[in-house]
């Protein structure tokens, strides 16, 4: 709903005479205070900020001079006083407010520079419960909200990144309404995000997956040229979660990531993280959030080649994710193909030099792999609401696989089944994945019927075989995975026609017996996982 009027009755220009400074992040605060003092502004401060300013030789009053009350309870109570909040909330041209200020000796505060206890940082670092609670700021948010509400007369600054803009604004000693309003909006967003972090931390501490109120906060990391399509606006907000991935990775080279780049890179890195680097190098190639090819191999270079072989046509302009450090040999292979993004836990210096030959290629170092078993939440907006669920961190290695056919899978078939099911978990439903010897042979994604996904995957495999001069597609003797149950035997029969000899699926269809009978008729081994992996 649009706001009827975007302004309240207020003077456009307000002269800054008294400033209250209370910050945990002291970056730039001495320089700001010195500039304010140079303009004749009275400085008032609290605790550690007061000490820092006094140590810098600046004339600064302690907040107790405004309140007539000392800081008590280890600093828990120092600004929660009418002497402070009256100075922030008073309507300057209201006669009753002015009379109350005079009667109680309240000094008007024109500028508040405040940032908060580092709760988010302490939480991210895994602080214990008492330490984290102690870093919940009370007085800071109260002063910020009071100042922002009274932005008609008070300027609130909560971000050190805005100090230069503040100094530019007060070049003549005043701030204008538009600036105060902008800073007020930013201030309320800051306190909302802060409270969201606290609320979510308590929910985690109490193991409340779905609390009565769920607040999601984020900080704008970058404003994008456009969204999924050029006519859509977009921005990338980060939540502070320290899960290795596109939000925390370092961009070593290349252009700014687009909306689609970020979405696809996240999908690619989460997929490749299913494969533990200590077991084998792995590579996943993604296009439009679906894998084109996934493979493991004795070397990273070979894993890349095998992943590419699955569907080299679709891989053009794709995203490459690796589960180990990008080395020079693999980099030399990758630069042969147009690629949008590479993401890896780390990148060798030699590989960086090779990738630098493609200056537009975005290269990300994530600093590690996300733990596929770590719990967390995912969210999706719908009209009028927010769908929130726990992350799909079910792992096929943790499942008790049930052999439902007369023939049990061979050891190799079982390995291929598990590999295919891992990949199918990351393919848009309906998903069918053929795999053989640690390599995807064909991937069918996002079809409305499962049999069509099975057919498309087989067609992809045949095309790949022709492109690479193979006598037969890799689906011959492969295992096939379906991320949800096979509702009819037709999908299974399509996979058998493509050459699959083993099937892995959740099971649970009303026609399971029909599907099992078809598998037995063709001497195909089939196992049920009991776990579905829909992905939309």
Curated annotation (Swiss-Prot):
InterPro entries: AICAR_Tfase_dup_dom_sf, Cytidine_deaminase-like, MGS-like_dom, MGS-like_dom_sf, PurH-like. Gene3D superfamilies: 3.40.140.20, Methylglyoxal synthase-like domain. It catalyses: (6R)-10-formyltetrahydrofolate + 5-amino-1-(5-phospho-beta-D-ribosyl)imidazole-4-carboxamide = 5-formamido-1-(5-phospho-D-ribosyl)imidazole-4-carboxamide + (6S)-5,6,7,8-tetrahydrofolate; IMP + H2O = 5-formamido-1-(5-phospho-D-ribosyl)imidazole-4-carboxamide. GO terms for cellular component: cytosol. PROSITE patterns: MGS. Keywords: Hydrolase, Multifunctional enzyme, Purine biosynthesis, Transferase. GO terms for biological process: 'de novo' IMP biosynthetic process. GO terms for molecular function: IMP cyclohydrolase activity; phosphoribosylaminoimidazolecarboxamide formyltransferase activity. It comes from the Bacteria. Pathway: Purine metabolism; IMP biosynthesis via de novo pathway; 5-formamido-1-(5-phospho-D-ribosyl)imidazole-4-carboxamide from 5-amino-1-(5-phospho-D-ribosyl)imidazole-4-carboxamide (10-formyl THF route): step 1/1; Purine metabolism; IMP biosynthesis via de novo pathway; IMP from 5-formamido-1-(5-phospho-D-ribosyl)imidazole-4-carboxamide: step 1/1. Belongs to the PurH family. This is Bifunctional purine biosynthesis protein PurH.
């Amino acid at each position: 709903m649009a706001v009827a009027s975007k302004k309240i009755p207020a003077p456009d220009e307000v002269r800054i005479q008294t400033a209250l400074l209370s910050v945990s992040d002291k970056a730039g605060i001495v320089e700001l205070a010195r500039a304010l003092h140079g303009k004749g502004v009275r400085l008032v401060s609290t605790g550690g900020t007061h000490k820092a300013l006094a140590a810098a030789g600046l004339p600064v009053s302690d907040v107790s001079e405004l309140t007539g009350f000392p800081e008590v309870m280890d600093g828990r109570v120092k600004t929660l006083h009418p002497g402070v909040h009256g100075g922030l909330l008073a309507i300057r041209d209201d006669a009753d407010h002015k009379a109350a200020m005079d009667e109680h000796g309240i000094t008007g505060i024109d500028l508040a520079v405040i940032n908060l206890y580092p709760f988010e940082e302490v939480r991210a670092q895994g602080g214990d419960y008492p330490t984290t609670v102690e870093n919940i700021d009370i007085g800071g948010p109260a002063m910020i909200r009071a100042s922002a509400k009274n932005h008609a007369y008070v300027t609130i600054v909560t971000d050190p990144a805005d100090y230069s803009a503040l100094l530019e604004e007060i070049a003549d000693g005043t701030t204008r309404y538009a600036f105060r309003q902008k800073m007020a909006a930013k201030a309320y967003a800051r306190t909302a995000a802060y409270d969201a972090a606290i609320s979510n931390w308590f929910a985690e501490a109490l193991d409340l997956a779905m609390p009565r109120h769920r607040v999601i906060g984020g900080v704008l990391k970058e404003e994008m040229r456009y969204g999924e399509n050029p006519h859509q606006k977009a921005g990338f907000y980060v939540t502070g979660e320290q899960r290795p991935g596109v939000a925390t990775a370092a961009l070593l080279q290349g252009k700014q990531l687009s909306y689609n780049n970020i979405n696809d890179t996240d999908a690619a890195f989460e997929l490749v993280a299913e494969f533990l680097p200590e077991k084998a190098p792995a590579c996943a190639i993604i296009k439009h959030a679906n894998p084109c090819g996934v493979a493991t191999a004795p070397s990273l270079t070979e894993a890349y080649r095998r992943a590419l072989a699955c569907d080299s046509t679709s891989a053009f302009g794709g995203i490459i994710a690796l589960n180990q450090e990008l080395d020079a040999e693999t980099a030399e292979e990758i630069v042969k193909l147009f690629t949008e993004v590479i993401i890896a836990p780390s990148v060798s210096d030699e590989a960086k030099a090779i990738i630098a030959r493609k200056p537009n290629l975005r290269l990300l170092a994530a600093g590690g792999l996300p733990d596929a078993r770590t719990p967390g939440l995912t969210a999706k907006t719908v009209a009028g609401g927010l769908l929130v669920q726990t992350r799909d961190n079910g792992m096929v290695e943790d499942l008790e696989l049930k052999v439902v056919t007369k023939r049990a899978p061979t050891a190799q078939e079982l390995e291929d089944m598990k590999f295919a099911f891992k990949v199918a978990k990351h393919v848009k439903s309906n998903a069918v994945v053929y795999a053989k010897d640690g390599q995807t042979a064909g991937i069918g994604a996002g079809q409305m019927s499962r049999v069509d996904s099975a057919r498309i995957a087989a067609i992809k495999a045949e095309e790949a075989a022709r492109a690479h001069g193979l006598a037969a597609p890799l689906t011959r003797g492969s295992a096939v995975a379906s991320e949800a149950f096979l509702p009819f035997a037709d999908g299974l029969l399509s996979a058998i026609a493509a050459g699959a000899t083993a099937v892995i699926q959740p099971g649970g269809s009303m026609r399971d017996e029909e599907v099992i009978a078809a598998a037995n008729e063709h001497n195909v081994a089939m196992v049920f996982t009991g776990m579905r992996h829909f992905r939309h």
